[in-house]
Each structure stands twice: as structure tokens, then as C-alpha cells.
Amino acid sequence: DVSLVGKLYQTEYSYFTAPLQEYAKGYLEGIVSAQGKIYGGYLIPELITDVLLTQMNKDYAKVATDGFKMGKKELEFMLACETTGRERYMVLALLSAHYHVDLYSTDEDKRLENVRFRGYADYYTQMPLVFSQSRIDLNISLKTIRTGIPLRVIDVLGCGGFVLSNYQEELMEYFNVGEE
């Protein structure tokens, strides 16, 4: 019935937040939570402050012996992946409670008991078949993709499939909501 081809974006978020003080942990959790509720906007870069990074790196210095320091771009990417991973998990969990859901990925998550893990789907030989044979193909874009029509949407439509996508501003420019 429903298919997702792609990563689950399982991150090292809990590992990298473990040594942090409670304020920093809460602040990062707030960023992930807020970004997860916003479509059509990307908040993460503006919410990562120099003060936050300085405090995080002080906390890391207390436990790291290799001189590890978190950079702004690395933190931004980790938070974007964590947000996307949570969204994909939630969508798959909710849909799999009511429909047959297949995940084509090298990632697995034991918590998704009702999802059928199908393994890797080759872009040229297997993906077109998945897209054309599924009733609904999911597109849940990585949060760093701010604009543009995701390639996955074009892939699915090019194979004659039906795609259900997260909001991307450009989709409204080229498609009529509720009609196409």
C-alpha cells in the first residue's frame, strides 16, 4: 500500500547530547521540536548561537580526551537529521498501524514492528518498480532542503506513481493542491 525509499536518519544525537548540561540539552530538544512543527521554514541555523556552541564545547572538553569540538555546520546537520528521523519514524509508525507499509532502506528500527523492511532498492532497476507498484509513495525531505521540488517527487511521478510529500514551497507553484 505505502512505501518509503530512503534513510531513517538515525543519528548520534543522544550520544552528543549526553555530556551536555541540562539547559543545552533542553535548548537543543526545543530546536528539534520546533523545527518538526514548521513546514516552509528552516529555523535551525538561526537558533544555533555562539554562546550555545561555546558552552557545548566546554562540556565536551570535560569528557573528551581527543580535543573534539562541535562546529556550527556539524550541529546544524545533526539537528536537521534528528528532526527528519523523528518525522519519518512518526509517519511510518502511524501509517503502519492502519496500512501495509514497506521501507526500502539499509536502515532498520525494531520499534517499527508493523513496517516491512525490504532492504536497499537500486535507483535504476528497483526503485522505478517500487514507485509504480505502490499505491502511495512517501516523500519526507531532509530538513536542510529548503527550496525546490525534491528529486524523489520527480522520480515517483516519472514512474507513474502517486506521491504524498511534505510541504515544499515550489510544489505549490507547479501543482494544484487537492487536484494533482
Residue ranges and their predicted role:
Residues 1, 82, 103-180:
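Catalytic binding pocket for nucleotide-activated donors in carbohydrate/polymer assembly enzymes
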Residues 1-15, 123:
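Conserved, well-structured beta-alpha core segment at the onset of a catalytic domain
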Residues 6-9, 99, 105, 142:
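Short, flexible loop/turn elements at secondary-structure junctions
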Residues 10-90, 94, 98-100:
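Extended, charge-rich helix/loop segments that form flexible
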